[in-house]
């Protein structure tokens, strides 16, 4: 069965603590490359609310309940429009070359457990926000970290 094409509208969720340490996760599909990033993911349906996409992706990628009592999910009201990386172009319908990314923040307790989905990510690290920005492969992700 063929997978449906991805919707070119996604979220970027900067997971951080009150002390401004940022959770970065390493992509498992990046081969030998060091693709560190925050939580990202596309909408599952055109009418899926962005906050739902953000909470769902955080749960799928890290095991963190973004709507839990000790967490605060915030829509930063920032949109980035960028060219889809060539290595991931085939996931989108023919002719789709750009993605609209919506930025969220998620403040979590420092001791929140992280449970990665090994099909998507191979490692995680908590870093002070400036160091996290330096490690991100995506410029929009780095900029979002620096907004903390």
Regions found by a protein language model. Give the residues of each.
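Conserved N-terminal beta-strand and adjoining loop/helix that marks the start
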Residues: 1-23, 46
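Short secondary-structure boundary/capping segments
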Residues: 3-5, 14, 94-96, 115-117
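Short connector loops at helix/strand junctions that flank enzyme active sites
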Residues: 8, 38, 97-101
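Active-site beta-strand termini and strand-to-loop segments that position acidic
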Residues: 15-18, 27, 106-108
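A conserved beta-turn-beta hairpin within the catalytic core of GNAT-like acetyltransferases
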Residues: 30-35
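The catalytic Nudix box helix
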Residues: 38-76
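Active-site segment of metal-dependent pyrophosphate-handling enzymes
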Residues: 64-112
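NUDIX/MutT-family hydrolases
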Residues: 102-146
């Amino acid at each position: 069965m063929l997978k449906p094409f991805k919707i070119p509208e996604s979220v970027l969720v900067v997971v951080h603590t009150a002390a401004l340490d940022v959770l970065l996760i390493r992509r498992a599909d990046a081969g030998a490359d060091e693709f560190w990033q925050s939580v990202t993911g596309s909408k599952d349906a055109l009418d899926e609310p962005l906050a739902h996409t953000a909470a769902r992706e955080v749960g799928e990628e890290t095991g963190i309940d973004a709507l839990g009592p000790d967490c605060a999910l915030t829509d930063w009201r920032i949109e980035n429009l960028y060219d889809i990386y060539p290595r991931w172009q085939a996931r989108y319908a023919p002719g789709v070359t750009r993605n609209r990314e919506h930025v969220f923040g998620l403040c979590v307790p420092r001791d929140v457990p992280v449970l990665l989905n090994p099909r998507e990510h191979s490692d995680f690290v908590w870093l002070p926000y400036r160091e996290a920005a330096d490690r991100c492969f995506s410029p929009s992700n780095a900029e979002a970290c620096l907004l903390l």
